[in-house]
Amino acid sequence: MKKIPTVLLTFMMLVVLCTGCTSEKDGKAKQIDTPYVYPIQPGTEEWAKLDSLDAKIAACKVDPELMDSMTTEALLETVLDYPLLPNIYAFSSTEIGIGSVSGYFEGLQMLHDREDAAECIQKAIDTGTDDPLRMQYLQTLASYVRTRLGAPDF
């Protein structure tokens, strides 16, 4: 008789544990609300020592799992602060530039895929900034995420 409650209790605990694991994996909560701080920045002595694009890309690498767990606001700031973001303008079109930079910085595609990215970017635009380059980035990113909605702006 004592075995039945013990087996039943064990089974129920396993079900609860398995359900918890599935929920965490499938419905990842975006809980990190601070953007990534890049350890090496343009204009520093460390940056000047990086002698190739590959070296700069490696120095700016952000763990995709970290970005995936960020709120959209934190991810947007991480993208805006990306030291190689200006490279999106180094091509004949912004679309080609974003495609190129997305090849070595996953943050752009992650931002593009967020359901609330357009709203988050628009909020940042509406808030305004004294930095004209930041505003240009925001407007470019706004056009980029609109492609997720099927309305390319490039």
Q: What does each of the following model-derived ranges do?
A:
Residues 22-24:
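Bacterial signal peptide processing site
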Residues 1-8:
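Bacterial N-terminal signal peptides that target proteins for export
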Residues 17-20:
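C-terminal motif of bacterial Sec signal peptides marking the signal peptidase cleavage site
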Residues 27-28, 36-154:
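Non-catalytic all-alpha helical scaffold/repeat segments
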Residues 11-12:
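Repetitive helical segments and hydrophobic/amphipathic motifs
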